[in-house]
Structures are given as C-alpha cells and as structure tokens.
Amino acid sequence: MIKKDQFAHQKKKMKIIDNFLDQKTYIDLVKVIMEARFPWNFVNGKSEIRDGDFQFTHLFVDDGGKITSPYYKILFPLLKRLDPEKIYRIKANLTTKKETNHKSLMHIDTNQEKIKTAVYYCNTNNGSTLFQNGKRIDSKANRIVIFDGHQKHCGVDLSLIHI
C-alpha cells in the first residue's frame, strides 16, 4: 500500500498504533474473521513455498490490486483509517499454536521502496512480528504496525494463547 500522509516518505520509520479501530468496529471485524465458516486456505510455507512452515491465508486483494474476496467489505473501516493511495495486496494470515515461539524465515514483502506494509493483529497472544534489527512487536488485539514493505521481518508463532 502507498500512504498519502507524510509517513509515506519517511525512510526506515515504523508506526505502532494500539486501539486502531473503535471497540464496536473491532468486535464486528473479529467476529467475521474468527467465525468457523470464514474461508481459510492451507499454504505449504510462510516466507517461501515449502520452507518447512505452513499457515492458513485469506487473500482479499491480489498482488495486482484486484479484489479476490467477497469479504473485502469488512476491511472498509481499516482502509478508511489507513487511507492508502493505492492497495497492492491484502492478505490475512492464520498461524497455529506451536510448542515454542517458532520464527519463520526473515523476508521482505516488496522490493519497491514507496510501499508500506501494515500488520493488523486480531487477537492478543504471545506471538509477534520480529524485525531484522531486533525490534519485536507483540501480537496485541486491535494493534497495527506500519513499516516499509522492503524491511526484513518475520512472524513468530504463538505458543500460549492469552485471549
């Protein structure tokens, strides 16, 4: 996503916002995403195909900016707050509980410098997003972290659920 605001042209900056959505909007969003009928797809790999990890994903918008999900409209409150100039991809990741806080491989989301990545956390648990510089962002319900899409990062799976 390319941001319209002044944050878009700041290099190597990261923005963390707690309580990103108002409580009612947050609850409405999570109810849909966490319901048993929400369609998740198995992916053999997290950072790369067949990297030894797996996750479930839901693609709302593909790499070309095409809407691919009938659930896209549930993202309107998030998109309204983010106010992107353009959307390149929107994907939800669902990871499963592991025995330890397993780290996936470090990766970048794009080589393009102007594109920002936004990670929105639907629940609180002991998983996180870890950056190459050692910075760790804990998974906290209704938190969002916005950073340069070419900044190396990885997911750290949850091992205990604290909801």
Residue ranges and their predicted role:
Residues I137-H153:
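Conserved metal-binding segment of the jelly-roll/cupin
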Residues L105-H107, K152-S159:
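Short beta-strand His + acidic residue motifs that chelate non-heme Fe in jelly-roll/DSBH
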Residues L94-N111:
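Conserved short histidine dyad/triad with adjacent acidic residue
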